[in-house]
Each structure stands twice: as structure tokens, then as C-alpha cells.
């Protein structure tokens, strides 16, 4: 049995490192960056979808806090953590439901 050279072993580790970087780390970092951008753009009047499937309109955003208030209809409001917002909906989405 022939022993592998140290360079070929190092080459294999470098290949696995590159695969890990481009297949796992980089896409996740990109998603995190997009989510942070989404969180910074939240404002009063924005229609959002939460992780629990709740759709509502933001009525209050507190900058110092992680919580926001969402109006589900004219009489019901809930307070949630801003990290549970999954996506921003187009204007008028609530009226079309």
C-alpha cells in the first residue's frame, strides 16, 4: 500500500473547506444580511407576514425595543418580537383577503 503525500491530503482539506464555504456559510450569511435589511426597513403602515402565519399591518415600531405592534383588524392588535417577521407584503394585501 502506498502512502499519500502530505500535499494531496492538504489539497483534499482545502477542497472540503471551499465546498463548505460556498455551499453552507456564504448562502446563510447572505440570508442573514437580507433579513437584517428587512428588519431595518420596518415602519408604521407596513403589511407583514409573521413566522406563525399571522398577517397584519404594523401600527407601532419602538426603536429601542425588539417588539412591534401589529394590527390584525380594526379592533385587534398584538405585540410580537420583530425577529418573527418573515416577509413584507405588498401594499393592499390585507384588503384583498
Swiss-Prot record:
Belongs to the YajC family. The keyword Transmembrane applies. It comes from the Bacteria. Part of the SecDF-YidC-YajC translocase complex. The SecDF-YidC-YajC translocase forms a supercomplex with SecYEG, called the holo-translocon (HTL). It is found in: Cell inner membrane. One of its GO terms (biological process) is protein transport. The chain crosses the membrane at residues 5-25. This is Sec translocon accessory complex subunit YajC. It is a single-pass membrane protein. Its main location: membrane. SMART domains: YajC (SM01323). Coiled coil: none annotated.
